[in-house]
Design a protein with these regions (language model features):
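Acidic/polar low-complexity flexible segments
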Residues: 30-92, 149-247, 291-335
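A mature extracytoplasmic/lumenal domain signature
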Residues: 126, 137-139, 161-163, 286-288
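Beta-strand-rich interaction surfaces with strong enrichment in secreted/lumenal proteins
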Residues: 120-123, 269-274
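Short, well-ordered beta-strand segments enriched in hydrophobic/aromatic residues
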Residues: 86, 130-137, 280-286
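Exposed beta-sheet edge/beta-hairpin loop segments within beta-rich domains
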Residues: 271-278, 296-301
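N-terminal Sec-pathway targeting helices
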Residues: 4-18
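Short amphipathic, basic-aromatic surface patches that mediate peripheral association
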Residues: 138-146, 292-294
Length: 335
């Protein structure tokens, strides 16, 4: 009996310590958790009049951002656009540039803990055929790599597809549309598919049944046989992230919250990126097609549109949720 009493006492003591430890962890988390600030575009001092004004949490994590005035973007109408396949076209020098501060994504894990890109420049224009946006930001050296320890530079533009959609990648029944460009994909277009031999030129060697030739066997040319592609599961299942014959360095996505990004196949969006003298210049282009749900939305209310931006610094190991972002930014489309 005495032994049973001692066992119960020990169990109660251990249980008590466990409860105390959990309580302390919870208290420390609450006490040290970064503050969350709601930041809503407010032209004229009223947020209610804007489509997509989110009531959800902001990802800035900085109270000062709440008081900072948001930039205003005007998508100018031109008779003739700059070249849609050349982000370095000198004609962009004649189009107004808006400088936009960036913040760290700190709403959902994995969060960005260190800001390495402070701001991004945006220019926007359209004509009867196309809508175009040019983004540029400082990047001392471009990052194209994609392996377990190295990551690619990237940038994205996001638009709400329904009034009230949070800028944090939308929400249930409040979708957003995104255009996502990646430096690695640009290199695929410019120089050919960046194969395993490109990442590990002096160390990679393997054997795949049914692949043509002897190792190293380039994925882009040695795996035409469907039997060989069984060993490349992403390619054989049509995963858009595994595409080896990419036609554009851009992906159109739809989302309704964190972790819900979905590829839009056969997208009409095009993009082109170029790195020059310590800066990336990325040009997005979208046909002016009234059947396109986003373009249709633009013309339903051209004075009260919005966009948000995201930038990934590959050299700083940005990827996924580890990114620099903006809140919704008011945008008007000139008629």
């Amino acid at each position: 009996m005495a032994g049973n009493d001692n066992s119960r006492r020990i169990a109660l003591f251990v249980g008590g310590l466990f409860v105390i430890a959990i309580t302390m962890i919870a208290v420390i988390y609450v006490a040290t958790r970064r503050p969350v600030v709601v930041v809503v575009p407010q032209p004229g001092g009223e947020a209610a009049g804007l489509p997509g004004a989110a009531a959800g949490p902001s990802a800035t994590g900085e109270a000062a951002a709440a008081a900072a005035p948001l930039p205003q973007i005007s998508q100018v109408r031109l008779d003739k656009l700059p070249a849609t396949d050349d982000p370095l076209d000198a004609a962009w020098d004649q189009i107004a540039t808006v400088e936009i501060p960036l913040d760290m994504q700190q709403t959902a894990a994995p969060m960005l803990e260190q800001k390495t890109v402070a701001k991004i420049n945006l220019q926007a224009a359209h004509d009867s055929q196309q809508f175009v946006w040019r983004l540029s930001w400082e990047q001392p050296e471009p990052s194209y790599k994609s392996n377990v320890a190295q990551f690619s530079d990237a940038v994205a533009i996001q638009f709400p597809m329904k009034d009230g959609a949070p800028y944090t990648m939308g929400g249930p029944d409040m979708p957003v549309s995104m255009m996502y460009w990646k430096a690695l994909w640009q290199k695929d277009i410019d120089e050919g598919f960046q194969d395993v031999t490109s990442v590990y030129p002096n160390s990679w060697y393997d054997l795949y049944w049914f692949a043509k030739g002897t190792g190293p066997q380039p994925v882009s040319s040695a795996f035409d046989d469907p039997a060989a592609r069984q060993y490349l599961t992403g390619v054989s299942t049509g995963n858009p992230m595994s595409t080896i014959d990419r036609k554009q360095p851009v992906q159109e996505l739809a989302a309704h919250g964190f972790g819900s990004s979905t590829d839009i196949p056969n997208s009409p969006v095009t993009a082109r990126g170029a790195w020059k003298e310590g800066r990336w210049y990325v040009l997005f282009s979208r046909p002016n097609d009234s059947v396109d749900p986003l373009i249709k939305r633009f013309f339903e209310n051209p004075e009260q549109q919005m966009l948000a931006l995201a930038v990934w610094d590959g050299a700083a190991q940005n990827r996924g949720g580890r990114k620099h972002i903006t809140n919704w930014i008011p945008m008007r489309i000139e008629k």
